[in-house]
């Protein structure tokens, strides 16, 4: 690659927005003492945690901005739209969520017909009932999906995966520390409470709760850990339908596939065979009442947020208050807005982009992406630990990346979704969920559509998809503090530049490195290079695992490995790209800070946040991303340029000896 390919976003200093917001800083702390506190402490003090949040940071501020934009958009749609139009569907779904009087009047009535159907089930109907719930409503016992074949990314494959855990992670059922026991006990009470609200009598609800806990604990005992799930090679287990029926005969697979509307399943990837074997065992050992109660609970719990206030409160108390430490519920308009935003996502996105996404942002992002791609290519070419053979393969993959910016070129068709205000809120939500699930299942037998997006344009996030070898940056993240055409290069490269580098590096993290340029799970590494990579990754993981996040709980560097590698690579690559800009080549201070200092301050400010202790513990269990403080303080201590920028030396708390610094990408 030629350096001539690099284009600059440099802007003359006289035309820049403020490069560093000094109010974000806590100058009572030295950068070498605690850089995160120095860079973000002022922001944290000025933005105490609102009780409706378990975590709130600059990332969430941008999400709030996007939410306000969507609110204004939908509120201004008006009521006079042709029935069946996108505007009618979005508007009606939003307004149904606002109608608390109607929701409270209806109570549990929207559930009764479906519960009655489940309660009438005999054992022979259980597999069809599971399929009905898997059609977008709930995931009892296990989960299923249609996605690209891990080893043939151009075709779709049917997958069976572990599931059925209402608490979302096996550790909540198996560990016995004080916080986990508290959560588990609260969950058992929640199961009992929502079943009572759904119409169960007190004693029956208590017995049903015990059955649910028994079933979910059994499923948890055989579930793969989150660390184990990072290794896709151990989860690619292909079965013919005949083998599926032979190995797991207590599940009526014909009824299950038929319930999903599929008659063309010829092979299945069973990602966690032990979990499906346990379901097969439970389908025989459970009595009819236990089976029905578990299915009813899954149905009711999934519906709770779309019903009367007592259901919504029960859900909040369990999953937001107990699990995350939130003190108060979000206002109704925010909760109502999230429903069309999630269920009619691209329809809302089409309206959002037309109003809020300036075309020039796409051009600037394309320049940045190109600069980052060049920088990562140079890093790969210059790696001392990687052989020429593997480097060639890595560069082929890098140069094959598909880049998606802003919004899709073609939009989803929601004409088959019916939103009718004459029906209950839950019935409308259920119908939209079923539509989405049917769309996903209907992809079986079709080529993978590589033009599809996995996120909506109004989502404040970005992603890398190994099956398509693509990086995607939705419109909503292309706003300050991540991206601002008026900001100086240091600010943009420290924020959105690192995000771009982060997503690119995911193609070469502990999971992404196992996929080739076409998105197929192929080993393109020499054995020696793979061993060297693993040694470096383990050293990086150990840095994070050494950190105590709360009480005596440590971060899990193995579980967060991919995100940590991506943060580390994103920082290094974006810094290199920044140093090729005119501003990066110079040393002109703005607001009293050098370009390198502004780069690192910009990066840290992206992760400024306040967070509850409960949310720290929850995220440590279930989130593959490190906490914001560690995404800053651990990651940057591997970069020589950080120490040089702030004059950090031996004896400072932030200092890390050169021999202990890790360079992967």
Question: Predicted regions: what is each one?
Answer:
Residues 43-47, 167-168, 481:
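Short, solvent-exposed loop/turn elements at domain surfaces
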Residues 52-74, 205-222, 492-498, 591, ...:
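Short secondary-structure subsegments characteristic of cysteine-rich extracellular domains
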Residues 63, 212, 247-250, 269-273, ...:
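Intrinsically disordered, low-complexity linker/terminal regions across diverse proteins
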Residues 14-23:
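Short, Gly/Pro- and small/polar-rich lid/capping loops
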Residues 30-33, 38-102:
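Active-site-surrounding "flap" and adjacent substrate/cofactor-binding loops of secreted or lumenal enzymes
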Residues 24-45, 173, 177-196, 561, ...:
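Hydrophobic/aromatic-rich, well-ordered segments within soluble, folded domains that form packed cores
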Residues 1-13:
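Gram-negative bacterial Sec-dependent N-terminal signal peptides
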Residues 77-367, 371:
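Noncatalytic, helix-rich "gating/capping" subdomain that lines the substrate-entry/channel surface
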């Amino acid at each position: 690659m030629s350096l001539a390919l690099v284009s600059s976003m440099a802007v003359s200093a006289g035309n820049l927005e403020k490069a560093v917001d000094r109010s974000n800083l806590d100058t009572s702390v030295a950068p070498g003492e605690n850089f995160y506190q120095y860079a973000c402490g002022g922001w944290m003090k000025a933005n105490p945690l609102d009780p409706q949040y378990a975590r709130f940071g600059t990332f969430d501020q941008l999400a709030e901005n996007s939410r306000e934009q969507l609110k204004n958009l939908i509120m201004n749609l008006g009521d006079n739209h042709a029935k069946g139009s996108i505007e009618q569907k979005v508007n009606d779904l939003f307004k149904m969520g606002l109608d608390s009087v109607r929701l409270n009047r209806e109570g549990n009535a929207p559930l009764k017909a479906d519960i009655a159907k489940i309660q009438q089930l005999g054992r022979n109907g259980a597999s069809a009932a599971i399929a009905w719930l898997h059609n977008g409503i709930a995931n009892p016992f296990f989960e299923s999906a249609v996605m690209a074949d891990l080893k043939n990314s151009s075709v779709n494959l049917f997958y069976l995966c572990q599931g059925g855990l209402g608490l979302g992670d096996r550790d909540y059922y198996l560990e016995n520390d004080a916080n986990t026991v508290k959560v588990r006990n609260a969950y058992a009470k929640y199961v009992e409470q929502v079943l009572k609200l759904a119409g169960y009598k007190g004693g029956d609800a208590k017995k049903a709760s015990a059955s649910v806990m028994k079933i979910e604990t059994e499923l948890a005992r055989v579930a793969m850990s989150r660390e184990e799930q990072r290794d896709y090679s151990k989860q690619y287990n292909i079965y013919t339908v005949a083998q599926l029926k032979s190995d797991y005969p207590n599940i009526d697979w014909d009824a299950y596939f038929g319930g999903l509307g599929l008659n063309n399943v010829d092979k299945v990837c069973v990602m966690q065979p032990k979990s499906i074997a346990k379901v097969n065992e439970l389908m025989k050992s459970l009595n009819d009442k236990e089976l029905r109660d578990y299915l009813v609970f899954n149905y009711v719990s999934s519906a709770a947020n779309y019903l009367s206030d007592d259901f919504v409160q029960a859900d909040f108390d369990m999953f937001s208050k107990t699990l995350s430490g939130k003190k108060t519920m979000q206002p109704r308009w925010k909760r109502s807005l999230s429903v069309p935003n999630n269920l009619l996502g691209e329809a809302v996105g089409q309206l959002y982009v037309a109003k809020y996404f300036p075309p020039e942002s796409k051009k600037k992002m394309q320049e940045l992406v190109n600069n980052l791609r060049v920088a990562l290519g140079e890093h790969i070419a210059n790696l001392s630990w990687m052989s020429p053979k593997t480097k060639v393969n890595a560069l082929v993959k890098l140069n094959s990346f598909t880049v998606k910016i802003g919004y899709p070129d073609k939009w989803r068709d929601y004409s088959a979704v019916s939103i009718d205000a004459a029906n209950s809120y839950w019935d409308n939500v259920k119908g939209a969920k079923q539509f989405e699930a049917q769309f996903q299942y209907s992809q079986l037998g079709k080529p993978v559509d590589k033009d599809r997006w996995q996120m909506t344009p109004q989502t404040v996030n970005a992603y890398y998809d190994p099956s398509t070898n693509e990086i995607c940056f939705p419109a909503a993240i292309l706003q300050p503090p991540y991206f601002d055409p008026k900001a100086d290069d240091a600010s943009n490269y420290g924020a959105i530049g690192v995000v771009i580098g982060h997503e690119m590096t995911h193609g070469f993290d502990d999971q992404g490195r196992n996929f080739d340029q076409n998105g197929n799970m192929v080993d393109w590494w020499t054995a020696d290079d793979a061993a060297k990579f693993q040694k470096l990754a383990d050293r990086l993981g150990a840095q994070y695992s050494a950190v105590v996040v709360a009480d005596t709980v440590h971060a899990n560097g193995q579980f967060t490995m991919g995100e940590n590698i991506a943060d580390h690579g994103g920082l290094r690559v974006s810094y290199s790209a920044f140093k090729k800009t005119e501003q990066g080549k110079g040393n002109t201070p703005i607001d009293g800070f050098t370009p390198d200092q502004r780069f690192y301050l910009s990066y840290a400010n992206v992760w400024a946040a306040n967070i509850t202790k409960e949310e720290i513990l929850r995220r440590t269990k279930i989130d593959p991303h490190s906490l914001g403080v560690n995404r800053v303080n651990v990651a940057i201590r591997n970069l020589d340029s950080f120490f040089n920028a702030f004059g950090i030396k031996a004896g400072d708390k932030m200092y890390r000896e050169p021999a202990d610094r890790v360079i992967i990408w």
